[in-house]
Regions:
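Non-transmembrane, aqueous-exposed alpha-helical and coiled segments at domain scale
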Residues: 52-78, 106-109, 311-363
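N-terminal regions that are enriched for targeting/export leaders
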Residues: 1-84, 161-168
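Internal, well-ordered alpha/beta segment that forms a basic, Gly-enriched binding/recognition surface
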Residues: 116-220, 226, 235
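Glycine-rich phosphate/pyrophosphate-binding loops
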Residues: 103-124, 363
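An acidic- and aromatic-residue-enriched active-site/binding cleft used to recognize and process polar
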Residues: 81-84, 115-121, 239-244
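Aromatic-residue-lined binding/catalytic grooves and analogous aromatic/hydrophobic interfacial grooves
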Residues: 181, 185-326, 336-340, 345-346, ...
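Short secondary-structure boundary/capping segments
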Residues: 93-96, 127-136, 253-257
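Histidine-anchored nucleotide/phosphate-binding helix
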Residues: 92-107
Length: 363
């Protein structure tokens, strides 16, 4: 085992177990062993497929959106490993190509490859949603960062930030030309990136989208069509928080739905908070994660919310990036309004609850 793999195994027990069981296999052999692990459908799985189809239709049309839903219906597996951002970062590209390969091993054509991605990272996340990553370069860290968004917006959340504007693209291209003149990247790479910016980022398809969240869906579909010389698949990215918010609204309309029981019945809610305390993707007491939902403020900054109960009423409370106290009543109406106006974002627990536990999709 290489030094890097040894360090990986030491820091990540799950990776160590994976290497122990499958370290001697080829990628194709390993991919061939992955499959849906059925659970009972507690709520209709077609609800999720309807929301997927409805989300993609305005971007790609009824036929492509329908094929995306059909692929998920047949395979019952959701790729949820990636942050929602224009896919320049190398691990993201590798992961999406592996998912494409897995679907083709299952007998799919690979023309449409669906992804559910997490839109809660900040722009300064290590996958660099703030701009483009260039790997053909002489930078000491092995990649060159070309920002679209100014430094002052580095703490803004991908889910809430405005889209990449033509001025942002022009600024990035000016920086790219400077770096090429310095020899930081090859002229061939600089030419390819400039062509991409003009043909994709400045296209009507991308610029008609008002938010980075929407633009990412279009950009990544156009990017993936350039990955291969013999085929032009569309990798269709949907923010999992968007899908979860729409499913929650469906659930809230049914009084007996388990989601509402978990959120609004005091005894069940208290048991859930205790059981998931310290679990990855959930919360750790009052110090880590968030209780069910994140808050989003007018700076597009994400902040945690904590459940508080007083006089029999429950509310989510927190402090935003401006130092203001925020209180959201834990009611169907307040949560629905917050999800619609963008002041609330679903946490990972609710995202996986809706897709995996309630509607039987392997994630």
């Amino acid at each position: 085992m290489t030094e890097q793999m040894t360090a990986l195994a030491e820091n990540y027990p799950a990776a160590a177990e994976l290497l122990r069981r499958h370290g001697g296999e080829t990628l194709l052999t390993y991919l061939g062993q992955l499959h849906h692990r059925p659970l009972p459908d507690i709520l209709p799985s077609e609800d999720l497929l309807t929301e997927v189809r409805d989300y993609f239709t305005p971007f790609f049309g009824v036929e492509t959106a329908g094929e995306c839903a059909d692929v998920l219906r047949r395979r019952r597996c959701l790729s949820t490993a990636n942050h929602h951002h224009p896919a320049f970062e190398y691990m993201t590209v590798q992961d999406t190509i592996l998912c494409d390969r897995w679907l083709r091993l299952q007998g799919e054509s690979g023309a449409v490859v669906p992804f559910l991605s997490c839109a809660n990272p900040r722009l300064d996340n290590n996958v660099y949603p703030r701009g483009m990553l260039v790997y053909d370069c002489t930078a000491p860290e092995g990649c060159l960062r070309l920002p679209f968004y100014p430094f002052k917006l580095r703490h803004a959340c991908v889910a809430a930030v405005e889209g990449i504007s033509p001025d942002m693209v022009d600024n990035a291209l000016n920086r790219l030309r400077q770096e090429a003149r310095r020899g930081s990247c090859s002229l061939r790479t600089a030419d390819a990136l400039e062509r991409f910016c003009r043909e994709v980022l400045l296209s009507d398809r991308v610029q008609r989208c008002g938010t980075l969240r929407e633009q990412t869906t279009v950009i990544n579909a156009m990017l993936s069509q350039r990955y291969f010389t013999d085929r032009a698949p569309q990798y269709l990215w949907m923010p999992m928080e968007t899908r979860t918010a729409r499913l929650l609204e469906r659930d809230f309309r049914t009084e007996a739905a388990l989601t509402g029981q978990l959120l609004f019945r005091r005894e069940l809610r208290a048991a859930l908070l205790r059981a998931l305390d310290g679990v990855s993707g959930c919360w750790t007491g009052n110090t880590g994660g968030t209780h069910f939902f994140w808050g989003l403020d007018r700076r597009a900054a994400l902040f945690p919310l904590r459940l508080r109960e007083s006089a029999g009423a429950a509310a989510l409370t927190g402090q935003n990036s401006l130092g203001e106290a925020v209180t959201v009543p834990l009611t169907q109406q307040a949560l629905t309004e917050g999800l619609r106006d963008g002041s609330l974002l679903t946490g990972l627990f609710l995202c996986f609850l809706e897709a995996h536990f309630l509607r039987d999709f392997t994630v």
